[in-house]
Structures are given as C-alpha cells and as structure tokens.
Amino acid sequence: MKNKPHKLFISYSSKDAEYMKAFVDLLVTIGVHKNQITCTSVPQCNIPVGCNIYDWLAKQFQMSNIHVVYAFSDNYYSSVATLNEMGAAWVMRCKWTGLLLPGFIFDKLAGCIDKNQICIKLDDPDIITLKQRLRQFRDDIIKEFGLESIDEDEWEEKRDDFLNKIKIIAQKKDIEITSSE
C-alpha cells in the first residue's frame, strides 16, 4: 500500500481535553478534515463505537501515514495510555510534532522522543516565536496533506483566537489548582 492516507493522531491526557478541542478547531481552519484527525475528546474525531481501542489504533498506524501531535504536560507523563501511544508511534517511526501545554517546560520532556526536536511551547513568552512556529506547523501540514493554502488574514485571526483560548483555559486551570489547595 504505497499511497497511504495522511492522518493526524493527537496524543494527550484526557485532563488536557479542553486544549485539544481548541487545537482541533485550528486544524480544521487549516483545511484538515475531522475524519483525518484522531482526537478522542472531539466527537467527530474519536474512535468508533464498538471498536477495540488498541486494535483500531494499531490498524490506523499500519494503514495510514500518521503524523502524531503530542500535547506534553505533567498530565501526559502521568498517563499510562499516552506513554503507550508514544511508544507505539516511536516503533512505527511516525513523524511527530510536540506541543508543550502551558506550564510545561522543555526540560521535562522524557521518553522515546528526540528531545532535540523543536516543539511549540503554547505559553511561550516570545509571541513572535510562538506565532512563527505555529505558521511553520501550518505550512508543514498543508504540504503533507496536500491542502490548499489558507488566506493569511483568516489564518492570523484563527491563530490568535486559538492562542486566546489556550490562555483562557490555562488561567481557568490555574484557578482550579489554586482553589483545590
């Protein structure tokens, strides 16, 4: 099977689902169809009812060109399921992109991933670098999936909306953490 379909697999902790819902919205803006995305917190992107999760995922990894997006956080590294996903993607030599969720730092990256690969830090204080890395990711996905380019003004608006959502979610999570202490 030479021309395998391109698919995105988002590996994240269920505790970080809000971030990933916003990220899927950004992917759809780029032109990725929801049937090309696996993200279990988004109804149109989740694993079909009645399927064995691990069998379904194994088939996806074998039958598709998978690009994994890791949503790294402390929650990620506390989840056996996400660490299993990381191992499976490593064994299959999948292309991957790392998102560092707010509050997570590069020094905490661990596991079988290449720690020298540049990731996107979603709370990077250098907003120019953050926007540049998101644009590079967009361009890579457009090329990889054979998508049409998005209007630059529309992209900037949707990207900024995404970054604002990330900020709001992070602030909400900070409040939840503070109030539970």
Sequence positions of predicted segments:
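C-terminal interaction surface of TIR/SEFIR-family domains
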Residues: 1-9, 17-25, 29, 103-181
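Short glycine-/polar-rich loops that comprise or flank the Walker A/P-loop
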Residues: 6, 33-35, 63-67, 92-97, ...
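Long, contiguous alpha-helical segments
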Residues: 9-11, 37
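Short hydrophobic segments within beta-strands
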Residues: 11-13, 99
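Short alpha-helical
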Residues: 15-18, 77
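Conserved BB-loop
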Residues: 25-59, 75-82, 138-142, 147-150
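Structural signal for conserved beta-strand scaffold positions within catalytic alpha/beta enzyme cores
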Residues: 39-41, 98, 120-121
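Conserved beta-strand-loop-alpha-helix hinge of the TIR/SEFIR fold
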Residues: 56-107
